[in-house]
Amino acid sequence: MKFLELNKKRHATKQFTDKPVDPKDVRTAIEIATLAPSAHNSQPWKFVVVREKNAELAKLAYGSNFEQVSSAPVTIALFTDTDLAKRARKIARVGGANNFSEEQLQYFMKNLPAEFARYNEQQVSNYLALNAGLVAMNLVLALTDQGIGSNLILGFDKSKVNEVLDIEERFRPELLITVGYTDEKLEPSYRLPVDEIIEKR
């Protein structure tokens, strides 16, 4: 599918049918999503595919988001790793000498952790939010490419998600992504004309 066509096909899907979503299709979409760029190639994301605990997770969603999560066959909870130094070292450890030069291994094992140690809390938060946005957009496009609907949800009680899903506190919840099929005819949302958002200097 051409990129323009793919973007035009992507819509916020808020009502889902009972048709199940194949776990293999979800895994494929996540695998494609992780090809997204990330600052320093830090890849600070974690995906939790929620099926059995979806009803519990839905209780944390605000307003109409409750209905969306409740009706979705699958919800993907996207987390980011707040221990950036540990994440950098994990990349070096898992990738190993087969994928990295000695210089690159040094970069992930020592250079990056030293840089991350200088970040204040706000810098870490901004860093994680940016990288979460990059991979989330890739994920919904990957789902769209397989004919699967999705919606990005920001409105939920982030303070309780780790407990409900039994996820280590070091991981920060960023988004809930509801996933499934729909029989609704979805219309594109209004977009500002491109000349309204471009300035030249």
Regions found by a protein language model. Give the residues of each.
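Acidic, surface-exposed loops and disordered segments
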Residues: 1-201
